[in-house]
A protein has these predicted regions:
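ATP-binding N-terminal substructure of ATP-dependent carboxylate-amine bond-forming enzymes
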Residues: 1-102
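Short, hydrophobic beta-strand segments that form beta-sheet elements in well-ordered domains
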Residues: 29-34, 132-133, 166
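Short loop/helix-cap segments at secondary-structure boundaries that form the rim of catalytic
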Residues: 39-45, 141-146, 175-178
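ATP-dependent carboxylate activation and anion-phosphoryl transfer catalytic cores
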Residues: 70, 232-344
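A conserved helix-loop-beta module that forms one wall/lid of the active-site cleft
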Residues: 95-162
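Phosphate-binding site of ATP-dependent enzymes
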Residues: 164-246, 256-257, 261-263
Length: 344
């Protein structure tokens, strides 16, 4: 079961699982959940179930109901808010059902989710890091930390929400006034042509199964173009970071290669929005984790080192009866309820 299937991360996980069905003859039956019946992923799974938002009291009971009704073996969070919520609920879900919640340990999730702790973790372990300070609501950035340009983003971030490049004091004041939450001001690492996102696939006991490095171009915080990259210096550093972190499933590490080394600014303790691309390249992280958990042999993947990817906008089509049923809370079965036009 994949949660939050309206998100790009969840949809990428679904694509990877479907690719495993095609390429490796798996028999994964994919159940998707979301609080929004309009979410495209609700029409791309084998069964779709409407759920409350993850901070609502009824969320846990609804998940348990779906898991029991469908014999769910693995539960994979597809959004950052659900990553946090399911970290708190994991023990109870696994006690009440036979499912396994695919999550990293709580402390490592917190290291990734708290952007100040991310920088502190890197600093404490001797890795290159961006200078980072906390900004409490109502307080201004200390003058000694005003080295512009700089990045300002929520301390407890979700993707690129709230992130902004700040070029001067007036701009930072206006930006902070928009948010009633803790923020961080972070050193701007200006090496956009040397930006990499790195995938680390972990097994059930923390074994590092494989790594992949992608060089990417961003637009509004999202990967628009990516290519598999050979970067020995980046590879060495992510292996060193993996040796300190305790991983389960996947980590996504983002940073830029500079004269100081590979400066990491994001450690996302979850599957990534580029999970599907990685699967096509040879590293299918959701499938690798599931097979390893089931005590099956997971061979070292052969990565297609020449693969590139460019994203484009697409649509998912479905009929009004299907949409109305989901809107009213009915679970949809009978395979995929929608389709993508084969334009190309």
């Amino acid at each position: 079961m994949v949660t939050g299937v309206g998100s790009g991360v969840a949809q990428s996980i679904i694509k990877a699982l479907k690719l495993a069905n095609q390429k490796y003859k798996r028999n994964y039956v994919i159940i998707g959940t979301d609080a929004n019946w309009k979410a495209a992923g609700m029409y791309a799974v084998d069964k779709a179930c409407l759920v409350p938002r993850c901070r609502e009291k009824s969320y846990l009971q609804r998940l348990i109901e779906i898991i029991r009704d469908n014999g769910v073996a693995f539960l994979i969070p597809g959004t950052d808010p659900e990553l946090q919520a399911l970290s708190d609920l994991k023990e109870e879900i696994e006690k009440e059902t036979d499912t396994h919640v695919v999550l990293n340990p709580p402390d490592t999730i917190e290291i990734g989710y708290d952007k100040f702790r991310t920088a502190s973790f890197l600093k404490e372990n001797g890795f290159p890091y961006p200078e980072t300070v906390c900004l409490v609501p109502g307080e201004s950035l200390p003058e000694e930390d005003q080295a512009y340009p700089l990045i300002v983003k929520p301390r407890y971030g979700s993707g690129s929400v709230g992130l902004s490049l700040i070029t001067g004091p007036a701009q930072i004041g206006n930006h902070l006034a928009m948010y009633d939450e803790e923020m961080v001001a972070q050193e701007y690492i200006n090496a956009p042509q040397q930006e990499f996102t790195c995938g680390l696939a972990f097994g059930k006991d923390g074994e590092l199964l494989s790594t992949i490095i992608l060089q990417r171009d961003l637009k509004k915080g999202f990967t628009q173009f990516a290519r598999v990259a050979r970067q020995p210096e980046v590879q060495r550093q992510i292996l060193d970071i993996a040796g300190v972190l305790e991983g389960r499933g996947a980590y996504n590490i983002q940073g830029q290669l500079t004269d100081r080394g590979f400066v990491v600014f994001e450690i996302n303790p979850r599957f990534s929005g580029t999970t599907a691309f990685r699967a096509v390249a040879g590293q299918n992280e959701p499938d690798m984790y599931i097979q390893h958990f089931l005590n099956r042999t997971v061979p070292t993947p052969e990565i297609n080192q020449s693969l590139c990817m460019s994203r484009y906008l697409n649509e998912y089509y479905f009929d009004t009866d299907t949409a109305d049923a989901l809107r009213q809370g009915e679970s949809r079965t009978a395979g995929r309820a929608g389709f993508v036009m084969d334009y190309f």
